[in-house]
């Protein structure tokens, strides 16, 4: 197969990684990973390819052996975020299907974009340092040279030495835990389902565990483990049962959740076996567990069946949003599918407004040539991708679509695909005689338009029963002289409050500073532990230029590192008080993950790219 991912320099059309062994020591003093990584690569040519090209970025390579013999290698000039390709000589080439063994002595550097190191002071109980990795989209190459593309999948063995507990994206071999030099332990994990490089994950620190379901545990700091267990245990088993009924049985053995320190930049990262999750889902009210339904859904869409490049990322995220909403509807009731989709529509509108309706990043399929995938990251592949899947569901009917779901995930399990292969799979399935009555409908699908038209997709009719009350309250506020009461939102879910706040954010005329204050006080949005609600409220207060809220915004920006909150808050604070925005960023920049820090710099006009624009 020809290489089709523009975000990799690797020649994966000539060589394909089959197994990866990571023998790494976590060095908290030097803030680096060091050790050896072994790649077993299968030749895909008949001795024509005389070199293996791997992705690398800011990683130190000390030596390389090919089949246990030292070989020539060279790190080429850096090409921006794509990194510096590593060229390794294979003088004799290899027969097609032959597997060669590449052993590399490696060490990460301070420029590594995949790791975050926290001092004991940055953790909750202040007892031990903490380290975690975040490899998506193209950051695995800064951990060790690899074929850093979702179009290549490999099984993994992890042998990780650390003075503190280690979790990794595999199943633990607890019986194999061994003492290493200096009292450190070697933690062994195996991942027997082939996964792409971006799902390689490690974390280490003072970590405790508690069960949250028959196949699931939560891992987090010892002081938080009880509240995390309470937050997640009610829904975990229900989510798993609903997911397995919808697709087919879970293939990964265990499903665990690692709740990370607050500087984790995403809501969740679907690392297999261990979802890495933001602590902002632990809100004390069980209102933000949808993130777990989302990350669990990735066990089928994204992790088992994977988009072949970030250009087709909607195949991961659009499908996952669809499965998440089906799971939530199965557990909480059918109206919650539409309710969540309406919330998502608002996020999609916001993202498209931020980019501009004609921007190429608002297309479903994006040309990534010369583009850093992190720059294109937004709600678009999630929500516009969801609308692509949901459109097909409505077109053929739920009963028929539910038969397609397991067919699709079975056909592409352990493989990667692009949008056209998805299209062909859909057409192939519905070409059966029993679906003859759908022939004209399916022939009318404008695939090219759906894939490449920028801006909002057509909006379907949604069941608004759960949101009508939210819009009604927003209408009262729009009149400008409304006196609020805490009873206005009695019995509302956190998401209903979010819909209401989203409507207020969209008012043509912002609230007055006084109204914004009343809103925060009456509905307990200033003291809430729910960061989703607090952020939505602060965006209203900033637009209202309520200066009494500015310091609260700055404080929150020092407590959370999730980009969903950090980026819009910095953009909004920057509009009303740039000096405070800049001092807040300066004060907290080392708290943020490198990915979040780079994005916030762009939002504040501090990065070299932003200065050029």
From Swiss-Prot:
Q: What is its main location?
A: cytoplasm
Example of a GO MF term: metallopeptidase activity
Q: What is its EC number?
A: 3.4.11.-, 3.3.2.10
Q: SUPFAM superfamilies of this UniProt entry?
A: ARM repeat (SSF48371), Leukotriene A4 hydrolase N-terminal domain (SSF63737), Metalloproteases ('zincins'), catalytic domain (SSF55486)
What does the record note about the cofactor? Answer: Binds 1 zinc ion per subunit.
Any GO BP annotation:
proteolysis
What does the entry list as the binding residues for Zn(2+)? 294, 298, 317
Q: What is this protein called?
A: Leucine aminopeptidase 2
Q: Which species is this UniProt entry from? A: Pyricularia oryzae (strain 70-15 / ATCC MYA-4617 / FGSC 8958)
């Amino acid at each position: 197969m020809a290489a089709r991912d523009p975000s990799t320099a690797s020649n994966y059309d000539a060589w394909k990684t089959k197994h990866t062994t990571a023998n790494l020591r976590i060095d908290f003093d030097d803030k680096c990973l060091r050790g050896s990584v072994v790649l077993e690569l299968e030749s895909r040519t008949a001795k024509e390819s005389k070199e293996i090209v791997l992705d690398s970025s800011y990683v130190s390579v000390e030596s390389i052996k090919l089949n246990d013999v030292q070989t020539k290698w060279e790190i080429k000039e850096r090409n921006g975020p794509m990194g510096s390709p590593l060229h390794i000589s294979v003088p004799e080439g290899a027969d097609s299907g032959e597997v060669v063994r590449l052993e590399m002595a490696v060490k990460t550097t301070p420029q590594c974009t995949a790791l975050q190191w926290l001092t004991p002071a940055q953790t909750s109980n202040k007892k031990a340092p903490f380290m975690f990795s975040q490899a998506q989209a193209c950051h695995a190459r800064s951990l060790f040279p690899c074929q850093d593309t979702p179009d290549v999948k490999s099984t993994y063995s992890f042998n990780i030495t650390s003075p503190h507990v280690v979790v990794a994206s595999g199943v633990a071999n607890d019986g194999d835990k061994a003492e290493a030099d200096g009292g450190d332990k070697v933690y062994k994990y195996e991942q027997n389902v082939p996964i792409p490089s971006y799902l390689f994950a490690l974390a280490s620190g003072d970590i405790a565990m508690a069960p949250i379901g028959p196949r699931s545990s939560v891992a987090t700091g010892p002081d938080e483990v009880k509240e995390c267990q309470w937050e997640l245990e009610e829904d975990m088993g229900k989510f798993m049962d609903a997911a397995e009924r919808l697709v087919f049985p879970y293939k990964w053995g265990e499903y665990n959740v690692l709740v990370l320190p607050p500087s984790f930049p995403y809501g969740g990262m679907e690392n297999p076996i261990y979802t890495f999750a933001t602590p902002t889902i632990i809100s004390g009210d069980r209102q933000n567990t949808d993130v777990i339904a989302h990350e669990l859904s990735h066990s089928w869409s994204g992790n088992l069946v994977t988009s072949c490049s970030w250009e087709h990322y909607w195949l991961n995220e659009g499908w996952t949003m669809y499965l998440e909403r089906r799971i939530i509807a199965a557990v909480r009731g059918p109206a919650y599918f539409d309710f969540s989709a309406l919330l998502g529509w608002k996020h999609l509108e916001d993202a498209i407004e931020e980019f501009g309706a004609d921007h190429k990043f608002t297309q479903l399929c994006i040309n990534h040539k010369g583009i850093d995938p992190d720059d294109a990251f937004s709600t678009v592949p999630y929500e516009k991708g969801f609308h692509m899947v949901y459109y097909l569901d409505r077109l053929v009917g739920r009963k028929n679509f539910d038969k397609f779901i397991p067919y699709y995930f079975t056909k592409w399990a352990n493989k990667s695909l692009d949008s056209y292969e998805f299209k062909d799979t859909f057409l192939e399935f519905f070409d059966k005689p029993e679906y003859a009555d759908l022939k004209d409908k399916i022939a009318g699908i404008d695939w090219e338009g759906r894939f490449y038209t920028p801006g909002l997709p057509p909006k379907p009719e949604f069941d608004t029963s759960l949101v009508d009350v939210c819009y009604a309250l927003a209408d009262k506020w729009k009149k400008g002289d409304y006196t609020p009461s805490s009873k206005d939102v009695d019995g509302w879910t956190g998401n209903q409050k979010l819909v209401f706040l989203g409507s207020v954010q969209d008012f043509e005329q912002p609230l007055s500073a006084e109204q914004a204050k009343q809103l925060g006080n009456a509905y307990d949005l200033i003291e809430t532990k729910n960061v989703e609600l607090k952020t939505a409220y602060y965006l209203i207060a900033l637009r209202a230029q309520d200066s009494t809220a500015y310091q609260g915004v700055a404080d929150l920006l020092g407590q959370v590192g999730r980009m969903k909150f950090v980026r819009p808050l910095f953009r909004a604070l920057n509009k009303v008080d740039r000096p405070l925005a800049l001092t807040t960023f300066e004060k907290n920049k080392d708290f943020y993950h490198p990915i979040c820090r780079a994005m916030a710099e762009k939002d504040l006009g501090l990065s070299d790219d932003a200065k050029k624009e």
